[in-house]
Amino acid sequence: MDEIEKIALLRDELEALKLCDLDDLTQAEAGVKMGVSRGTIQRMLTIARKKVAKALSKGQAIVFE
């Protein structure tokens, strides 16, 4: 049986995704909550969203690191 490919989502990427997309915080608010800049949140969101989209479109598992 073939093993399902995995994509690793970092804890900070997951937290940024949760705060902005589920909790409806702005990137600036999420940055304050996480102790990072708005730009860092924006970067984490871009990376996380691409990883999730890739995993969903290719049937890959998402693992959290």
Predicted feature descriptions by range:
Residues R49-L56:
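C-terminal flanking helix
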Residues M44-I47:
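Residues within the DNA-recognition helix of helix-turn-helix
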Residues A16-L17:
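Short alpha-helical "packing" element that flanks the helix-turn-helix/winged-helix DNA-binding module
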Residues T26, G35-T40:
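Helix-turn-helix DNA-binding motif, specifically the short coil turn and the N-cap/start of the second
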Residues V32:
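Alpha-helical residues within the helix-turn-helix
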Residues M1-R11:
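Short, Lys/Arg-enriched anionic-surface-contact patches
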